Amino acid sequence: MNLTDRIALVTGGGRGIGRAVSILLASLGAEVVINYVNRPQAADETAAFIRQQGGKAESLGFDVARAGDVQAAVKDILARHARLDILVNNAGITRDGLLVKMKEEAWDAVLDTNLKGSFNCLKAVSRAMMKQRWGRIINITSVIGFTGNAGQVNYAAAKAGLLGLTKSAARELAPRGITVNGVAPGYIETEMTSGLPAEVSAGIMAAIPLKTLGKPDDVAGAVAYLASDSANYITGQVIHVNGGLYM
């Protein structure tokens, strides 16, 4: 796969899955803009690592949940790079809690970042990609968007919403040469899963046919494929990366 001279924006690109995606896209030749909102050190370190490996990367802070901030950031990227080819909507948070105890603030925070944030970014980049008549948009959803999960009604709703956003945007943007697809990770070795209680981890492992958690690089590989010319004829689809947890 060759992404030479492609300009890519990866939201939440400094840690976990986002970091793996940023590093892989850069290794394939893309110039990567690594977004962060409150952890500049992680984004800066990832960008520095990429540059040390001979790649091109920079960090850029903005809140995906704020439409005005997103529009300003995309305008800045276009002013400096003249184009924007790849968007990876990876930024996401959790605010877990049982339905009957969940506060409105927890619901709003997750929907604002995980769903509205993806919409904001998708909308902001679409016009530039339409002018280019080429673009790749990859939304990071989740197995939880398909199966649901007790204690995560907000997260599940946001990730399921991303599925509808992906398919509808794919239909709208296809005539302009833009593909929109999703990648749905299962349980991946990240900060989000490292704090799970032992009994919860054991239950998860028992449900995964491959009997192991995935790695961020597993997800990054699917993203890179969808961002490449190898996936020219794929749009409105979701690639599952879950070890067989959901079939």
What are these regions (language model features)?
Residues N2, L122, W134, I178, ...:
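C-terminal substrate-recognition "lid" of short-chain dehydrogenase/reductases
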Residues I7, G14-G16:
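Conserved glycine-rich cofactor-binding loop
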Residues R127, R171-P175, N232:
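Alpha-helical segment proximal to the catalytic Tyr-Lys
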Residues S142:
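Residue(s) in the substrate-gating loop at a strand-loop-helix junction
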Residues A30-E45:
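Conserved glycine-rich Rossmann-like NAD(P)H-binding loop of the short-chain dehydrogenase/reductase
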Residues L122, A158, T166:
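Active-site helix of classical SDR
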Residues L98-L99, K103-L111, T193, I204:
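Substrate-binding pocket helix/loop in short-chain dehydrogenase/reductase
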